[in-house]
From Swiss-Prot:
Organism whose genome encodes this protein: Homo sapiens
GO BP: central nervous system neuron development; mRNA splicing, via spliceosome; negative regulation of cold-induced thermogenesis; neuron differentiation; regulation of alternative mRNA splicing, via spliceosome; regulation of axon guidance; regulation of RNA metabolic process
GO cellular component: cytoplasm; nucleus
InterPro entries referenced in this protein's UniProt entry, alphabetically: KH-I_NOVA_rpt1, KH-I_NOVA_rpt2, KH-I_NOVA_rpt3, KH_dom, KH_dom_type_1, KH_dom_type_1_sf
Primary localization: nucleus
Covalent cross-link site, Glycyl lysine isopeptide (Lys-Gly) (interchain with G-Cter in SUMO2): 112
Coiled coil: none
Superkingdom assignment: Eukaryota
Motif (Bipartite nuclear localization signal): 10-26
Gene: NOVA2
Presence of the UniProt keyword Nucleotide-binding in the record: no
Protein name, as recorded: RNA-binding protein Nova-2
Subunit structure as annotated in this protein's UniProt entry: Interacts with PTBP2; the interaction is direct.
Length: 492
């Protein structure tokens, strides 16, 4: 097949070429390179412009050629279109800066979750997406971005101030590409993306995957999210049968087939201060993993709430499971009321809850308002923080400053339970560090605390971060001990 002639009109190509990943030179004509970018569907229209005028003008100004996947041809597991940019390094950076500007203009309506089953991922946009850039790079380029022992990506983050994460590398199956997520303020993201473009220039195989459609790709492709499964798929949820069973057991399947949790936010007035912040943090965590928190207010009783949250926790990754378990404990507490009744699972110490919320605030888990926060608004934790601040001045500037001091905490974890904290390939440990902002280190295998079979777990960070990490680890250990007690055959 003859190669397609260049389009002299510089108009975007929306008819995807054949899906193919092959070894080829990293440049096009006259030192041009390729950069593949994910674009949220809400931003595509403003990038293309009426009748394609905006993108045509962008191509004229930068000298780049820009191709987009068709309007409903999304990257697997997302509602984002694939954009392939061809041009000089300067052109790639200029086009991406324009795209990033449009991505930051997230419509207010996109941040409002739809009322759907909490056990299903929501289709609305996470406000944090406005502060992210998502690039798709071949494995070879990903290796250069990471560098030996992670040295290169660490340097990029230190020099740019952005947070750079790559989708998980699977064991066994070798994915052709990986997704790079860059998070931060506009200038930070720009610096990090420029550094990534430099690695694209250095990689002879950086143009090996130039497809913009994944509709006919055979085999798995990389997950657009930096944590969780390496493979692109719908958000991790319970299988349909298990979800239906859990919902039916909790009396949640009404005429509309909706599953909701009435304890939140209906029960929020019963809590205040650190408890309120902890609840809102947990809600925000579930939302960040694709669970619909809007359906948490459908007026169902707390017993039903606990049932659904337990079902969510059973099928979620550790960070989301910890959030769901925390909400379940509060749902039980709200249901018990002053009259008592069944004793709810004991909530964690107030100090840990407050620290968990503070750590979330310090590490960007507050959520963002429309327009990257410039227009006010914010996620549920923002409102909770304001309410708590009004009630008792919980999040004062002085207290936040005090929380910035570094602290070292050591805890003991039984040898046979260390695997539960590490997770497969260390994923659970990575998630806990990302969620809290603390650094967590586990002593080497065979290195025990004197006179015990316990490994030493060292947590370093601000007091908020260390307490939050300690809480997550203790919750995980307690949960794993309970599972093994009820199922003695379970190991590791």
């Amino acid at each position: 097949m003859e190669p397609e002639a260049p389009d002299s009109r510089k108009r975007p190509l929306e008819t995807p070429p054949e899906v193919v990943c092959t070894k080829r030179s990293n440049t096009g004509e006259e030192g041009e390179y390729f950069l593949k970018v994910l674009i949220p569907s809400y931003a595509a229209g403003s990038i293309i412009g009426k009748g394609g005028q905006t993108i045509v003008q962008l191509q004229k100004e930068t000298g780049a050629t820009i191709k987009l996947s068709k309007s409903k041809d999304f990257y697997p597991g997302t509602t984002e279109r694939v954009c392939l940019v061809q041009g000089t390094a300067e052109a790639l950076n200029a086009v991406h800066s324009f795209i990033a500007e449009k991505v930051r203009e997230i419509p207010q309506a996109m941040t409002k979750p739809e009322v759907v089953n909490i056990l299903q991922p929501q289709t609305t946009m996470n406000p944090d997406r406005a502060k992210q850039a998502k690039l798709i790079v071949p494995n070879s380029t990903a290796g250069l971005i990471i560098g030996k022992g992670g040295a290169t990506v660490k340097a990029v983050m230190e020099q740019s101030g952005a947070w750079v994460q790559l989708s998980q590398k699977p064991e066994g199956i070798n994915l052709q590409e990986r997704v790079v997520t860059v998070s931060g303020e506009p200038e930070q993201v720009h610096k990090a993306v420029s550094a990534i473009v430099q690695k694209v220039q250095e990689d002879p195989q950086s143009s090996s995957c130039l497809n913009i459609s994944y509709a006919n790709v055979a085999g798995p492709v990389a997950n657009s999210n930096p944590t969780g499964s390496p493979y692109a798929s719908p958000a991790d949820v319970l299988p349909a049968a298990a979800a239906a069973s859990a919902a039916a057991a909790s009396g949640l399947l009404g005429p509309a087939g909706l599953a909701g949790v009435g304890a939140f936010p209906a029960a929020l007035p019963a809590f205040s201060g650190t408890d309120l912040l902890a609840i809102s943090t947990a809600l925000n965590t579930l939302a960040s993993y694709g669970y619909n928190t809007n359906s948490l207010g459908l007026g169902l009783n707390s017993a039903a709430a606990s049932g659904v949250l337990a079902a969510v926790a059973a099928g979620a990754n550790p960070a989301a499971a910890a959030a769901a378990n925390l909400l379940a404990s509060y749902a039980g507490e709200a249901g018990a009321g002053p009259a008592g009744g069944a004793a709810p699972p004991p909530p964690p110490p107030p100090g840990a809850l407050g620290s968990f919320a503070l750590a979330a605030a310090a590490n960007g888990y507050l959520g963002a308002g429309a327009g990257g926060g410039a227009g006010g608004g914010g996620g549920p934790l923002v409102a909770a923080a304001a309410a708590a601040g009004a009630a008792g001045g919980f999040l004062t500037a002085e207290k936040l400053a005090a929380e910035s001091a570094k602290e070292l905490v050591e805890i003991a974890v039984p040898e046979n339970l260390v695997g539960a904290i590490l997770g497969k390939g260390g994923k659970t440990l990575v998630e806990y560090q990302e969620l809290t902002g603390a650094r967590i280190q586990i002593s080497k295998k065979g290195e025990f605390l004197p006179g015990t079979r316990n490994r030493r777990v060292t947590i370093t960070g601000s007091p908020a971060a260390t307490q939050a990490a300690q809480y997550l680890i203790s919750q995980r250990v307690t949960y794993e001990q309970g599972v093994r007690a009820s199922n003695p055959q379970k190991v590791g």
